[in-house]
Swiss-Prot record:
Family in the record: Belongs to the phD/YefM antitoxin family.
Gene (UniProt): vapB49
Superkingdom per UniProt: Bacteria
Coiled-coil stretches: none
Protein name per Swiss-Prot or TrEMBL: Putative antitoxin VapB49
Task of the protein: Possibly the antitoxin component of a type II toxin-antitoxin (TA) system. Its cognate toxin is VapC49 (Potential).
Pfam families recorded: PhdYeFM_antitox
GO MF annotations, alphabetized: toxin sequestering activity
Record's compositionally biased regions (Basic and acidic residues): 141-150
Region (Disordered) residue spans: 124-150
GO cellular component assignments: plasma membrane
Entries under InterPro entries matching the protein: Antitoxin_Phd/YefM, phD-YefM_TA_antitoxins, YefM-like_sf
PANTHER family: ANTITOXIN VAPB46, ANTITOXIN VAPB49-RELATED-RELATED
Keyword entries, A-Z: Toxin-antitoxin system
């Protein structure tokens, strides 16, 4: 899509449902029937949605995105990249939110629980069962399985 060109058909729409206007730095959202996704950008890092698209979500701060199930299926890897970069994707079906896709912060959770004293780091090796020998089966397991199948 060329910047500054008048939107005349659905072919002028980029994959985020945004069409350009005469001014290159201003983007105008399309009517709801043509809109594939609604993007809320933080104005600190990305000025336009095309900046966000070109950077593949790594340089832009994205607050949240509403995306239809159809668009999610068509470009799943791009939406996963967005979630991995820290963005939040709200999945909608016929305009109704049904799910939220966000990155997992498992390392932060572990650090927080360790700092609160809820969990601690392992200090020793796991104890090995000692004192009793392993029980030996009286007959093979395959015989028992075949008995159960009869």
């Amino acid at each position: 899509m060329q910047l500054g060109r008048k939107v005349t058909s659905h072919h002028d729409i980029d994959r985020f449902g945004v069409a350009s206007t005469a001014d290159e730095s201003v983007y105008r959202p399309l009517p709801p029937r043509l809109r594939l996704a609604q993007v809320n950008l933080s104005r600190r890092r990305c000025r336009t949605q095309s900046d966000m698209y070109k950077s593949r979500f790594s340089e832009c701060t994205v607050q949240s995105v509403d995306v239809s199930v159809t668009e999610l299926r068509a470009h799943l890897s791009d939406w996963l990249d967005r979630a991995r970069a820290g963005g939040e994707v709200v999945i909608t079906e016929r305009g109704i939110p049904i799910a939220r896709l966000a990155a997992l912060d498992s390392t932060d959770t572990l650090e927080r629980l360790t700092a609160e004293g809820v969990i601690g780091k392992a200090t020793a090796q796991r104890p090995v069962a000692a004192g009793r020998p392993r029980p030996r089966p009286q007959r093979p397991v395959s015989d028992r399985v075949s008995d159960q199948r009869r």
